Structure formats: C-alpha cells, structure tokens
Amino acid sequence: MMAAKREHADCGAEPARKRVKENYKRVTGKLLSKMTISLENHLYYTFTFRLLNENKTEAYYGNLQCFKDLVEQECYDVSLNFVKTKYNERIEINEYSKCDAAIDENVAVKLCLTRADFENEEIVNVLAKLKCVFKRLGANNYKMVFDINMQDAGGAVFVQQVECFANLKVLASAAKAFVKSPDNFNSLMDFYYKNTNTLFYVHGVRCQHTSKGQNEFLNWTAGPSTSLETPSNTDNEDYINLVHSHSTNNISRANKHLKSMQLSLFKAEQKINDNGKHSFSVQFKTLDSMDDDDDTKWHKCVYYVDSNGNKEDPNDTNAVQKLAMDFDQLATCLADKLTKATIFVTADNADASTMNLLGLLKHDDEECEYQFL
C-alpha cells in the first residue's frame, strides 16, 4: 500500500505554508495508536509509532487518508515531511507503505525505577501491579494506581504506590489488547475492576516530579502510546516481590497511601463551617474487615467539597444538594442489597484510620455495569 503525497493545501483555513522539507527522514515502526484532535475549528489526525528496534515512540501528524489506511498494531515504512508555517512547525507523514519487518517486541522493560527517572521525566516501560482505577467525585479526570519497585540511592528496593493521570480515551487505548470493545465504558471498567492486583508491563508512561514546599511528589502521566502487556518473564525476584508485597506509602502524595474497599454499608452527614465550606462526614463498613479490625466497626472518612465557597452561587448549592442525594441513595441501595459499591480513600501513613474520600464506584460485575458517582 502506498499513499499519495500529501497536498500542501489540505488543512483548510491554516495559514499558507512557508516551507516544506519533503521526505527529510524515513522511519519504520509499529502503529500503536491513531486519534483525532478537534481544536479551534481544526481537525488534526495524529499517529503514534514504536520505532523498529528502538526503545522509544514518536508521534506524527497525518491526514484523513492516512487515518483510513493505517491500521493499529501493523508495521509501516514511513517518510516524513518537516512543515513550517508562519505560526508553527510540525512533522507530518508524507508517504507510507506496509512492511513485513518484525518489530522487536522485546522492548526493554524496567523492573524497578529510581528517583532519577522521575526527576528527568523519562518515558518508561516498567513492571507494575495494578491497584485500581478511580474517578474523583465531581470531576471528569481518572487515575490509575500501581504498585512498583523503587530503588533508593543505596540500591535497596521498596514497593511503593504511584498514581498515573489518564483520561477515558487513554484508559481505553491502554487496555486495547485485553478488551474487545474498549470504547464501551462498561467493558473497559470491567477489565480494570477485575484485574486489581494483576501485574502488567506498563509501556509508555511519563514520569513526573513536582514539589510544593517541603513535599515532593512523583507521578506518572499516561498518553496515546501507553499500553498494558502481560509480563513474559515472571521468574525473577522483582516480579515475585511485587506479587507478594502490599505498599503502604504513595510517592504521589505526602505521607498517605490509597485504599479501595468494597462496601457493605454507607452513610454520610452533610456539614458546613463558619466560612461556608461544605463537607461530608462519611461512615462505612466493608465486606472484608480492614486491616483485621472488627468487621462490625464503622470506619470514618471525610469528603471536602471542592467549590467556590460562595453561598450565593446556585451551581455550588445544587452540586452539594445533588451529592447529598447521591450519598443518601447509595446508603439505601446498599442497606437493601440492591447494588454493590467500592470506595476509594487516602489513608494517613501514621494512622490508617484517618481517611479522606476520593471516589465511589457503583457496580454490578455480573451484568458488567459500572458507574462512578
């Protein structure tokens, strides 16, 4: 298959192109993902390749014909144009043909990470244990949580939690090898929910390092090239260490770690302080006793409403009232055994009974139905 050369005027209202360095480079790679981006009345087509026998990915722009022709997980020879306009410059696919060259699937996978990986904001492929995927209450962003092996400056290895920023489209792309219809939300969440504590090779996540005051935070960010793969080498100390370890420290937070637990009972009381800030005092019981505590004990956590704190803002008021109703409905449904639910909390490292509520997931895993509050 060979595509015609790109027409230089196919970008609609874009400014006239000043210079095109045609076929400045040729690459061979496996197409990991393709996606469209709509921005300021322009539709952009983007393609992410894993380059032949190289431990890296690169992303290029293309056109509609590329999007129709190129098939994910196939290998292509691609020639690239460097295009410079008055306002920007970018690398675009010019010509492409399917090739039979075998991509080296044995991409180097790290079994543990170091602080330097985060400080240098490296893009890594790494062994990790999936702990959960959750969505924050009242927000549209998702997070994946993993256990990983972290090596300190002295060479000692400890299992730590790390959180990974992702949107729904990235979550779907990452699970493409395991989910038949990853764009179906229920199918996608069913995969992530049922693979808690499963080990994967996590490909193409970017390490990030931020600081606030005396605290430093290490995170991952997932992107279009991020993918999950079943580990091929399970006979090593690092793999076995992850299988049998349970982290109680989260490097993405200060002196906290994250827990997810299946609920048996739930109740919430709305509160408001003198400054008009809303919060909910939450109590819950879990199906499995937490940390070998008495399973009749009510566990406690707090949820602070992220609002403008403006008593006159009807949007704030309505959002709080809707959340109170959702909590009340969840309490009734659990008590009447009409639904199942999982709670996501942060727990203090020094006192695991001190918890803040992050998110709630209602689910019927037999019917493959999932809904985040």
Swiss-Prot record:
One GO molecular function term of this record is: DNA binding
UniProt subunit comment: Interacts with alkaline nuclease.
Can you say what this protein is called? Late expression factor 3
Coiled-coil intervals in this record? none
Gene Ontology cellular component annotations, sorted alphabetically: host cell nucleus
What is any Pfam family matched here? Baculo_LEF-3
Q: Where in the cell is it found?
A: Host nucleus
Query: What is the stated purpose of this protein?
Result: Required for late and very late gene expression. Lef-3 could be a single-stranded DNA-binding protein.
Recorded family membership: Belongs to the baculoviridae LEF-3 family.
Instruction: Please tell me whether the keyword Protease is annotated for this protein.
Output: no
Question: Which biological process terms from the Gene Ontology are attached to this UniProt entry?
Answer: regulation of DNA-templated transcription; viral genome replication
* Annotated keywords: DNA-binding, Early protein, Host nucleus, Transcription, Transcription regulation
Give the signal sequence positions: none
**Source domain of life:** Viruses
Q: Which InterPro entries match?
A: Baculo_LEF-3
Asked if Transcription regulation is a keyword of the record, the answer is yes
